[in-house]
Amino acid sequence: MKQTTMISAKDTNKKWYIVDAENKTVGRLATQVALVLRGKHKVDFTPHINNGDHVIIINAEKAIFSGKKESNKFYYHHSMHPGGLKKRSVEVQRELDATKILERAIRLMLPKNVQGSNQYRALHVFKGSNHPFAAQKPEVLEISTKKGDVK
């Protein structure tokens, strides 16, 4: 009888991927990147082992939203003081720090535990096409732009 093989933390080998976010929808990009960060694209996925890969996202400021979300979508946070609710539209957030848009979208798709925190550290988002990880020789990760088109 065959036994199910479980990998251990020392058996993981992490690859580096690079994604160009130019003209990619934020939500579709975030879901596919979150799967790679978790390692669910691998055959030997194990829920309790962090065997996800590193992902570098370039041109984060050129990612797009569908519909009118650019002006109608808001990010909320609260200072925990009375009257401390703050809100910021996507337009304003893009001007202040465009990388936070993708970072937040991807972070909220990862598990809300220690494992998710470790997987989130493997995400590297940059404005423009320059990044300091050329020495890792990242492979290009193709992100589908159509609904239902997974590569």
Swiss-Prot record:
Q: Which residues cross the membrane?
A: none
Q: Which GO terms describe its cellular component?
A: cytosolic large ribosomal subunit
Among its keywords, does the record have Membrane?
A: no
Q: Name one GO molecular function term.
A: structural constituent of ribosome
What's an example Gene Ontology biological process for this entry?
translation
Output the InterPro entries linked to this UniProt entry: Ribosomal_uL13, Ribosomal_uL13_bac-type, Ribosomal_uL13_sf
Q: Please give one Pfam family short name.
A: Ribosomal_L13
Concerning CDD domains, the annotation shows: Ribosomal_L13 (cd00392)
Keywords for this protein: Ribonucleoprotein, Ribosomal protein
Would I find Transcription among this entry's keywords? Answer: no
Cross-referenced SUPFAM superfamilies: Ribosomal protein L13 (SSF52161)
Family, according to the entry, reads as follows:
Belongs to the universal ribosomal protein uL13 family.
Among HAMAP family, the record links this protein to: Ribosomal_uL13
Q: How does it assemble?
A: Part of the 50S ribosomal subunit.
Database matches in PANTHER family: LARGE RIBOSOMAL SUBUNIT PROTEIN UL13M, RIBOSOMAL PROTEIN L13
What's this chain's function?
This protein is one of the early assembly proteins of the 50S ribosomal subunit, although it is not seen to bind rRNA by itself. It is important during the early stages of 50S assembly.
Q: What is this protein called?
A: Large ribosomal subunit protein uL13
